């Protein structure tokens, strides 16, 4: 098999040197972009150097260590796309408002807020595009404020410098032993299967609620992390296409096993049932490895094949999902062709995407960015401060990058501390070290490389202020061609950065995000819709796989309400009911199909209702329709395994009516 460069790292492969691999990678990328920027006679090599630092340092700070190869490349591609969108936005604003500078700045603030609003609605791995587009437009307009006719030239130069910086980062990543995620994926798949089997053992043995909650919570997080690894794997190379398809299905199989194990536990708690000795004999022995789980699942399959009458239906479903999981894991490990059996598994379900539940949260994020940049613009215009532009730029950068992260306040503090650290560090570099290196590009690269290396080590440790210090210090050094050493300009820029970050942090703290309860209620009502939407006689709709979307919403619920176990249990019950109702054998009937459509429409109205009274009225209507639906099923003399789950869903919704409708 032909090996790629990813499989043959060139440097820093030993464990002792691997700890400093990222710092050397970051340093090499920064120094190479600086050297090429001067060699190619770029106007502002500083942009290429900052791009290299941001693209390499950002993922490392988030990961708390060396980022995977795919993460760096993905970040680079997003930065290119976001820059192009920002340049187009800047050209459009300048062309339309060239005779009205104040209107131009106002449109800039609105554009930044709009981009941040969009970035809060899209998938989090792609949100960087729109956040970057917002402040790129602001940077271009501020840089060409006195000479708007040069905007196209400046936009082209900025795009060229950013592409150069990204190319240097990717080359450094390939050169310094890229960290492939494939081995981590294989290990996570094995560990996840062991965790799934242990959850099943706890469910069958009647463990206490605290242990069950802790275990399934950890498995949900590991399954979500596995889906993130799948995205990183695809960023590495296109040769992982087959593994990507398998991992998508493995995500569903893992969620199915979690759901079936939890349903088994809840069913046994409600109706205690004696577990056969033959079943206990297979389930009770502890498992320590992936091989042990494979052996136990095989024994369970033989037991079910011999006599499935005394085996809980949820356990049968769990074993089926585990069998599919084991089959697909083997394919991921080899990355071979997809067999016919695997293709049947992969094509069985059609995954459904759902819109974001954080629309109000996104609106607050956009408002924060728009207000913050408008305040910076007002401060600049009223004072006439020469570095008001860089203050505005830092406000836009901080508010755009911080809002989508789980803790915007900490991101704002990191930038504020970083800009404060950059003042003495930048002064040392700008006043004493860099002037002594003007006769030699080698000395210039060595001095900047030494600073980058030590800051890179701190970034890898997630030291507060380290990433902000790296970016802010490079920004105030003014690495232009030719270089000039204007002390007053340096101080203005350094202080402007600090004030901009302070204003951004104040806006984050003062404009509070009070949408938490609204988001939680929307998520819970979407769980209800997911459960009732499983009631259908349409075979095509039955193949719709809502499970990944439901667990994605559950994961968001976990992040927004980390200590509210009641919400978790309600959401988990709705997911369980979705899975149970999806398997009901409902006969083809025009009247039932019409009732299904009516129930779905009412559940959708519960989600869309803006007022509590309207929501409560629609929720009461939904309960009445479900009760009437159960009566129709009973009148048609359908078996209890069809009517009882519908009654169970109605009972759960009635118990939680206050939490769901008010």
Swiss-Prot record:
GO molecular function: transmembrane transporter activity
Stored InterPro entries: PHBA_efflux_AaeB/fusaric-R (IPR006726), PHBA_efflux_pump_AaeB (IPR023706)
Protein location: Cell inner membrane
Matches recorded under Pfam families: FUSC
Transmembrane region(s): 22-42, 52-72, 78-98, 102-122, 129-149, 161-181, 378-398, 415-435, 439-459, 467-487, 491-511
GO cellular component terms, semicolon-separated: plasma membrane
Keywords: Cell inner membrane, Cell membrane, Membrane, Transmembrane, Transmembrane helix, Transport
One BP annotation, GO: carboxylic acid transport
Entry annotated with the keyword Transport: yes
Main location: membrane
Topological type in the membrane: Multi-pass membrane protein
Protein family according to the UniProt entry: Belongs to the aromatic acid exporter ArAE (TC 2.A.85) family.
Function in brief: Forms an efflux pump with AaeA. Could function as a metabolic relief valve, allowing to eliminate certain compounds when they accumulate to high levels in the cell.
Protein name, UniProt field: p-hydroxybenzoic acid efflux pump subunit AaeB
Taxonomic path: Bacteria, Pseudomonadati, Pseudomonadota, Gammaproteobacteria, Enterobacterales
């Amino acid at each position: 098999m032909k090996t790629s460069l990813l499989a043959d790292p060139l440097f820093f492969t030993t464990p002792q040197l691997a700890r400093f691999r990222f710092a050397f990678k970051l340093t090499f990328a920064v120094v190479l972009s600086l050297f090429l920027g001067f060699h190619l006679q770029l106007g502002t090599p500083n942009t290429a150097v900052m791009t290299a630092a941001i693209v390499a340092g950002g993922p490392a700070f988030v990961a708390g260590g060396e980022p995977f190869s795919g993460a760096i490349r993905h970040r680079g591609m997003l930065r290119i796309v976001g820059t192009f969108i920002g340049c187009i936005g800047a050209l459009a604003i300048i062309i339309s408002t060239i005779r009205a500078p104040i209107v131009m700045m106002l449109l800039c603030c609105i554009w930044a807020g709009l981009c941040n609003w969009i970035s809060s609605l899209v998938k989090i791995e792609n949100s960087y595009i729109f956040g970057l587009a917002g402040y790129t437009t602001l940077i271009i307009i501020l840089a060409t404020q006195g000479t708007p006719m040069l905007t196209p030239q400046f936009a082209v130069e900025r795009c060229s410098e950013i592409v150069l910086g990204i190319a240097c980062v990717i080359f450094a990543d390939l050169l310094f032993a890229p960290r492939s995620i494939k081995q981590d994926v294989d290990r996570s798949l094995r560990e996840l299967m062991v965790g799934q089997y242990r959850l099943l053992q706890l469910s069958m043995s009647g463990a206490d609620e605290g242990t069950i909650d802790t275990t399934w919570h950890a498995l949900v997080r590991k399954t979500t992390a596995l889906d993130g690894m799948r995205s990183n794997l695809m960023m590495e190379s296109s040769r992982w296409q087959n593994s990507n398809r398998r991992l998508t299905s493995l995500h569903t199989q893992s969620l199915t096993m979690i759901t079936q194990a939890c349903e088994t536990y809840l069913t046994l708690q409600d109706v205690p049932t004696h577990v056969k000795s033959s079943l206990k004999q297979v389930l009770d022995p502890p498992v320590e490895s992936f091989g042990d789980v494979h052996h136990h699942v095989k024994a369970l399959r033989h037991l079910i094949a011999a006599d499935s009458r005394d085996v809980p239906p949820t356990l049968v479903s769990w074993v089926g999902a585990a069998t599919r999981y084991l089959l697909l894991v083997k394919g991921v490990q080899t990355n071979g062709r997809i067999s016919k059996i695997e293709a049947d598994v992969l094509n069985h379900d059609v995954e459904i995407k759902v819109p974001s539940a954080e629309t109000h949260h996104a609106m607050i994020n956009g408002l924060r960015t728009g207000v913050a940049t408008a305040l910076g613009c007002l401060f600049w215009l009223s004072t006439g401060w020469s570095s008001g532009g860089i203050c505005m730029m830092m406000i836009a950068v901080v508010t755009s990058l911080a809002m989508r992260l789980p803790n915007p306040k900490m991101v704002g503090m990191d930038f504020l501390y970083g800009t404060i650290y950059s003042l003495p560090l930048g002064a040392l570099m700008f006043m004493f070290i860099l002037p002594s290196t003007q006769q030699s590009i080698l000395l210039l690269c060595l001095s900047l490389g030494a600073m980058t290396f030590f800051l890179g080590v701190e970034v890898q440790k997630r030291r507060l202020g380290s990433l902000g210090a790296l970016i802010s210090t490079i920004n105030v050094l003014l690495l232009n061609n030719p270089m000039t050493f204007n002390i007053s300009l340096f101080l203005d820029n350094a202080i402007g950065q600090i004030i901009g970050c302070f204003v951004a942090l104040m806006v984050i703290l003062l404009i509070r995000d009070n949408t938490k309860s609204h988001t939680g209620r929307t998520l819970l009502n979407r769980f209800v819709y997911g459960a009732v939407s499983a009631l259908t006689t349409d075979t095509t709709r039955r193949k719709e796989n809502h499970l990944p979307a439901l667990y994605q919403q559950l994961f968001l619920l976990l992040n927004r309400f980390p200590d509210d176990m009641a919400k978790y249990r309600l959401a988990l019950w709705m997911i369980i009911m979705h899975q149970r109702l999806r398997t009901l054998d409902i006969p083809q009937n025009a009247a039932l199909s019409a009732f299904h459509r009516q129930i779905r429409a009412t559940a959708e109205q519960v989600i869309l209702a803006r007022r509590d009274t309207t929501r409560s009225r629609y929720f009461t209507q939904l309960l009445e329709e479900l009760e009437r639906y159960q009566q129709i099923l009973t009148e048609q003399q359908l078996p209890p395994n069809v009517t009882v789950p519908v009654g169970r869903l109605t009972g759960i919704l009635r118990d939680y009516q206050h939490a769901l409708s008010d």
